[in-house]
Amino acid sequence: MPWLQVRLAISPEQAETYEDALLEVGAVSVTFMDAEDQPIFEPDLNTTPLWSHTHLLALFEADTQPEAVFAHLQLLTGHDLPEHQAEVIEDQDWERSWMDNFQPMRFGQRLWIVPSWHEAPEKDAVNLLLDPGLAFGTGTHPTTALCLEWLDGQQLEGTQVLDFGCGSGILAIAALLLGAREAVGTDIDVQALEASRDNAQRNGIADDLFALYLPEHMPAMQADVLVANILAGPLVSLAPQLSGLVRPGGLLALSGILAEQGEEVAAAYAADFELDPIVVRDGWVRISGRRR
């Protein structure tokens, strides 16, 4: 059966207001979509991932009049509507259509991220199986891509890798598949640790090779390699702690940092690390270096 699809171009601040209003006027489903190809690999768990430019899609029964929907939305919100449109769409196999949007992606020279329903493009490559979901977006978010490419470029054989703020575990799992001896992941959210364990098992990684801890339970350690794809504020405030978690001569890679925040974060680590040039991509940066 056909459906009426209504699309609104909104900001994150408008999301809740328009979601509630659409449901009140009879939408049978409401979906948030990225308007500018800014997929999120590792959003905060228990949150709805929103982008700086978001499309809100709502489906209505086919006989719904779009003019009536827009009039009611304006009345309910008390504001002029943002950019909007309506169209009639035909029913389809939504699950298959959704799956077709996700293709294997390559990071660096060896590493691929491969959805479970796809054949690995290169059988002899390092293939990390990860299905789309909250921990996997429609493309390559610059921060996660920068970290994955950095890991791909390191000699990780025999190393211990710490993934600080592990989220889905994607960085630690990639490090293990690239040759790390063992990995440690830590996150403030128990659900993130559970997701990391599930993803590790899907990739054939034994539990004893990938230890997972809440921060307060993490043992004292100094890793050979530390990766942290979190936010600039915590990276600055935690700089003494993170620096102490890397052994002398060990490696560090940080992301989740906007370009304008790069110098501030780098300055917080400059005393303890010989830093590489900052790498910038699409307004995000990666900071890496070697412990003095």
UniProtKB/Swiss-Prot annotation:
Record EC number: 2.1.1.-
Main location: cytoplasm
A Gene Ontology molecular function term of the record: protein-lysine N-methyltransferase activity
Gene Ontology cellular component terms for the protein in this record: cytosol
Biological processes annotated in GO: methylation
Known catalytic reactions: L-lysyl-[protein] + 3 S-adenosyl-L-methionine = N(6),N(6),N(6)-trimethyl-L-lysyl-[protein] + 3 S-adenosyl-L-homocysteine + 3 H(+)
InterPro entries: Ribosomal_L11_MeTrfase_PrmA, Ribosomal_PrmA_MeTrfase, SAM-dependent_MTases_sf
Pfam families, alphabetized: PrmA
Disulfide cross-links: none
Alphabetical list of HAMAP family matching this protein: Methyltr_PrmA (MF_00735)
NCBIfam families recorded: prmA
Family statement: Belongs to the methyltransferase superfamily. PrmA family.
Protein name according to UniProt: Ribosomal protein L11 methyltransferase
Organism expressing this protein natively: Pseudomonas entomophila (strain L48)
Gene: prmA
